[in-house]
């Protein structure tokens, strides 16, 4: 017992061995392991390139650590064909809509013209043969419909979205505030007479899949698949590859694309510019990133700018006195900038205007460079028509592409300050389209603004009844007979016609 105690005492008094110094090779190996764990900050997969963290089933997207967004899809209304008073009312309501968003909410308006679906459109006007003696007439009528279809761009699937993003400490805090904003946005659309609906997580992922796969392809996904498979939502929407090494172009799967920004140079903007770009018969994606500036901060900034201009004006006047010429002769730029700054201050203080920072992005995709360049030149021509410039984002194609998807993230730091009325001039409404594919859909002519075919199955409308109104000799009877012939050739419905002036009797 005593021996064991002495042994333990001796062991306790022994000094610990000093730590061994690492060799140079070991230090290098440890540093390499740490570097690999940290990464180089670059995306090495297509999934890592897509800049959001998580998409939730209710439609909320966690974009960054504190940023959350939600998307609302909305339909078009007849703006360009409306009367002047109606257009003014729509424009003023749209200004109020934009003024609703404060500096804590970033807004993204997305206009997506998906790739051509001409085959589906032609299928909608195909008239099958029937067991009667009128198939030759059906063939002639079908050829006429195809010729009319070629005059428009019914093959393009057009969609409009508004995405709003906020910063919050947690998902719960973001969810409650996004719900309030969503309700207000839907009410504002209702005042405009616009049909709108919030998008679920599945719908947002399907939309992103369509952007990343412009050549088409089926989207197969369910949130219940994530846990068993260990995959993320990005695995179901990412293309086969991204390539951004060319500077002025990018490659996405089998497609080549290019993104540009709109440089606003015109002193006065026109509400037709956005509509003309969206009327191009090619796949194009236009995004407007809008961020409101705090009103008091905007006024302070403009006042400081006016003070600086006045100071420069005084210095120029002193220089004029010393040089012996009239002190009223100052550089024209000083006088111009001073007047514009004072006018802007007056608008913010007395005309219900706010200041916004706006970024306008235009993205095109095509099968080859030649087609892509032609699409870019077409959009560039429209911009020049309205005294603006469309410029390619050299060596920023990755950031521009990811800023062109509706998740509420803007990675392009090229912004233009605009007032509410100047921002609202990018009116997101043109004309309401009506193209219902179905076995009994009838042809009713072409849209007067877009030249797109009007194809309607009146049985599917809320009110299928119809009246033909017009002055004498304007073609009321011919219109009725044309619809009767169309219904006879397309459907198997029974037609009963009563004419009081014995023009026809069936």
List the predicted regions and their residue ranges.
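Structured core elements
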Residues: 71-73, 163, 361-363, 443-445, ...
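Short, glycine-/Ser/Thr-/acidic-enriched flexible segments
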Residues: 367-369, 449-451, 460-461, 473-474
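Composition- and surface-driven signal marking solvent-exposed, interaction-prone regions
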Residues: 373-379, 480-482, 497-498
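N-terminal pre-Walker A segment at the start of P-loop NTPase domains
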Residues: 433-453
């Amino acid at each position: 017992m005593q021996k064991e105690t002495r042994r333990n005492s001796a062991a306790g008094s022994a000094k610990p061995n000093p730590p061994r110094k690492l060799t140079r090779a070991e230090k290098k190996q440890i540093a390499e392991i740490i570097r690999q764990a940290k990464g180089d900050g670059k995306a090495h997969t297509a999934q890592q390139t897509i800049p959001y963290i998580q998409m939730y089933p209710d439609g909320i997207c966690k974009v960054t650590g504190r940023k959350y967004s939600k998307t609302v899809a909305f339909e078009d209304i007849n703006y360009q064909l409306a009367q002047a008073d109606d257009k003014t009312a729509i424009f003023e309501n749209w200004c109020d809509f934009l003024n609703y968003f404060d500096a804590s909410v970033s807004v993204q308006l997305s206009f997506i013209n998906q790739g051509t679906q001409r085959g589906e459109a032609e299928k909608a006007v195909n008239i099958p043969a029937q067991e009667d003696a009128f198939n030759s007439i059906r063939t002639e009528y079908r050829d006429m419909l195809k010729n009319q279809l070629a005059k428009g761009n019914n093959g393009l699937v057009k969609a409009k979205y508004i995405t709003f993003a906020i910063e919050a400490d947690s998902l719960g805090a973001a969810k409650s505030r996004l719900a309030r904003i969503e309700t207000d946005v839907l009410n504002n659309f209702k005042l405009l007479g616009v049909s709108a609906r919030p998008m679920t997580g599945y719908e947002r992922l399907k939309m992103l899949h369509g952007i990343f796969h412009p050549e088409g392809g089926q989207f197969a996904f369910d949130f219940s698949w994530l846990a068993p498979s260990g995959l993320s939502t990005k695995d179901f929407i990412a293309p086969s590859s991204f390539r951004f090494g060319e500077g002025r172009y990018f490659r996405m799967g089998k497609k080549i694309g290019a993104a540009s920004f709109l440089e606003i140079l015109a002193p006065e903007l026109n509400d037709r510019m956005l509509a003309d770009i969206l009327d191009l018969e090619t796949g194009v994606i236009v995004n407007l990133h809008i961020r409101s500036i705090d009103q008091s901060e905007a006024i302070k900034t403009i006042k400081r700018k006016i003070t600086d201009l006045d100071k420069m004006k005084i210095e120029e006047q002193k220089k004029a006195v010393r040089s012996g010429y009239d002190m009223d002769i100052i550089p024209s730029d000083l006088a111009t900038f001073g007047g514009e700054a004072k006018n802007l201050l007056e608008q913010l203080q007395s005309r219900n205007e706010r200041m916004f920072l706006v970024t306008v992005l235009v993205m095109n995709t095509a099968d080859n460079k030649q087609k892509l360049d032609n699409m870019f030149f077409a959009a560039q021509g429209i911009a020049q028509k309205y005294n603006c410039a469309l410029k390619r984002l050299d060596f920023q194609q990755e950031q521009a592409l990811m800023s062109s998807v509706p998740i509420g993230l803007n990675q392009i730091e090229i912004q233009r300050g605009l007032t509410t009325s100047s921002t609202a001039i990018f009116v997101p409404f043109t004309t309401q389209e009506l193209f219902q594919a179905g076995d009994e859909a009838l042809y009713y002519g072409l849209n007067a603004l877009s030249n797109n075919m009007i194809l309607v199955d009146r049985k599917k409308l809320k009110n299928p009844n119809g009246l033909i109104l017009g002055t004498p000799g304007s073609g009321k009877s011919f219109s009725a007979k044309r619809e009767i012939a169309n219904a006879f050739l397309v459907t198997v419905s029974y037609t009963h016609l009563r004419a009081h002036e014995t023009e026809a009797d069936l």
